[in-house]
Every structure is written in C-alpha cells, then in structure tokens.
Amino acid sequence: MANKDYYELLGLQKGASDDEIKRAFRKLAVKYHPDRNQGNAEAEEKFKEINEAYQVLSDPEKKAKYDQFGSAAFDGSGGFGGGGFGGFDGFDMGGFGDIFESFFGGGGSNSRRRNGPVRGNDIEYTITLTFEEAVFGVEKEISVTRNENCEHCHGSGAEPGTNAKTCPTCSGSGQVRVQRQTPLGSFVSTSTCDTCRGTGKIIEKPCSECRGKGSVRKTRKIKVNIPAGVDTGNVMPLRGQGEHGLRGGSPGDLYVRINVTPSKVFTRKGNDVYIDAHISMPKAALGTEITVATVDGNVKYTVPPGTQSGTMFRLKGKGIQRVNSNGKGDQYVKVIVDIPKTLNKEQKEALYDFMRASGEEFDEANVPKKKLFGKNK
C-alpha cells in the first residue's frame, strides 16, 4: 500500500492528539483482532495496517518524520538519495505485540518471540557546521557512545565456559499464554515470562565484564563525509552505526542531524543566497561597476544608470550547490542607495545646481551663498 495515510487508517485528522490516536487504535484493534476474525484474511490485513499506523503515530520521533516526509520516510524513498543521504529506515513490524500488550496485557496471537534477534536502537547526533563547511562539504570526526556486544562473552551475557539454561517456566519461548477477561471480552494473549524476563534463558553465572547484560557502553570515533549543500534540518543516516542488536539482531542506524551557523555576509534560502550592495546616489544615477562577494569569491557587476534603491539583480548559478548534484542555486544582489545624513557646503551647492538643471522648484533662500574673492557674498 504505497503512500499510506496513517491518520486516515485510524479514522483521524492530521494533528490528532496522543489520546485520540490511542482511542482510535484501541477501537479498531478490538474490531479487527485475529482472535475475533479467525480465517478472515481481510480483517487480518486491516489489523496489520492499523498496527503499522499506530506504531508510527504513537512514537513522537517516528510521528515527526511521518508528518514531514509521509510514509516515504519509512520505505527508503524520501530524503536526499545518494552520497550517504537517504530516507529513513522502515520500522520494526515485529512491534505489533508490544503495542497490543499496552492495552490488553499481552501481545495477541501473532506476537513475536521475545527471545529472538532484536535490532539495535537508532542513535541521533546533532553536528554544527560553519556556513562555509555546509556550502562546500566537509569530513568530520564525531564521538558516539553506544551499546556494543560484550567482547568477553560475545553478547551471550554468560561467563565464558558456562552455558545459559532454558527457562523452565516458558520452555525457552520467553512468553506465557494468558487468558484475560476485559470489558471488551475475553482475550487469549501472551505476556512476558517473569522468570527469564522474556529472554527464554536463565544465566546462572553472569559475565564478569557486562554483568549478564550482553552489552557494554563504548565511545567510538566515526568519520562522517558531509556533502556540499547541506542545510539546517537535513538528516544524514549512517547505516549500521547505531547500537548493536541483541541475540544476533542487526545494529541500528546513526542519524546525523545538521545544524548550520548563519553567515555574517550571506542570507541563505534553500540553495539561493542573498546579499546587499550599498552604493551612493551619484553612482546609482550614473551607473557604476561594483565588487560583489559570492560563495566562490568576488565578482564584478555593472549596475546600470538610474538604478533605484531596492532593485534586485540575479547572478545565475552563483548560489549553493544542490546536495549530490552539479546544479547550483542563484545569488541575488539587492542594491541599497545610501542617502547621506549630512552634507558639506560644496555637496549642497552641487545638489541645488542639479535641481536647477532638472527644473525643480525650491527656496533659493536655503542655497548657500557662493564665495567671492574668498568671502561669502
């Protein structure tokens, strides 16, 4: 189902509150639950869809990604593509049991086995770049602290030379079946085994390094190649650089969120840049050649005669490179004609002469008297 509308699947409007999302999911989950619709393939598919929608909309981070990018954020088609930039990864469809358990105390008949492989958590890291680094691209080294498999026990949690035994309560499944009576009816569900806490194993002698956790916290230095043209808010996914998975699960991803320090010279809007150029009244009237700063260095530009203050000129292709593309934005130069706040006597005389030549009316009493033999008339 391409371009899924998760709000529509739950019968909601975009922007629905957390409580509205929870109530809508609960109502539909009861209606389409497999235990109530055995053999109904359509109901089973509907149940999967509403679970998928709830898994996204109930998670603030996933919901924010969905609101910004739509369902493409989870199928790899969103984002920037190429060069390390791409859409956000798909989410763990095995999480339906956890969602249903939050309402009914169990994962339903289709819950995943909790002692199976578990994908590692994703990590988000914010990096701040200068304007120049964002424009031209840069390689950065960042330090990330994450959970990694314990090298001493290879992630088993048991001291080397010892073995973890199968949990006698759940027979290694990590779950026990429970029949619950709820206001909505009777449900046969599964719940986490209290004896082994869902792992299916009992560790009699925990690892001396990780104390039975199977993982340890480590800080790693990771090199990040940031392409030219990135901007504040861009997210760069580094696949497999998140926290390590459990019991053979795949590692999570590292999401590097970009923050760019504004330039003191340029104003950026997308891939275009804007700059002001100040010139005097005579130069605006007569035309002039000015030097304009661009991201690639200074260029000459001819301002035509009669240019008005606020006039915008475009320098095509002088903007910022588009991410993973040879295309570039444009630069816009706004001409600001400076009006002097004070004038000396000669400047005033020159302006009054200009007004006479233009046929403008003015009070001659305000005109400075011209000097005669070194003295004012």
UniProtKB/Swiss-Prot annotation:
Positions binding Zn(2+) 2 in this chain are C167, C170, C193, C196
* CC per GO annotation: cytoplasm
CR-type zinc finger locations on the chain:
137-219
Alphabetical UniProt keywords: Chaperone, Cytoplasm, DNA replication, Metal-binding, Repeat, Stress response, Zinc, Zinc-finger
Q: Which cofactor does it need?
A: Zn(2+)
Quote the subunit structure annotation: Homodimer.
Protein name, as recorded: Chaperone protein DnaJ
Q: Which organism is it from?
A: Clostridium beijerinckii (strain ATCC 51743 / NCIMB 8052) (Clostridium acetobutylicum)
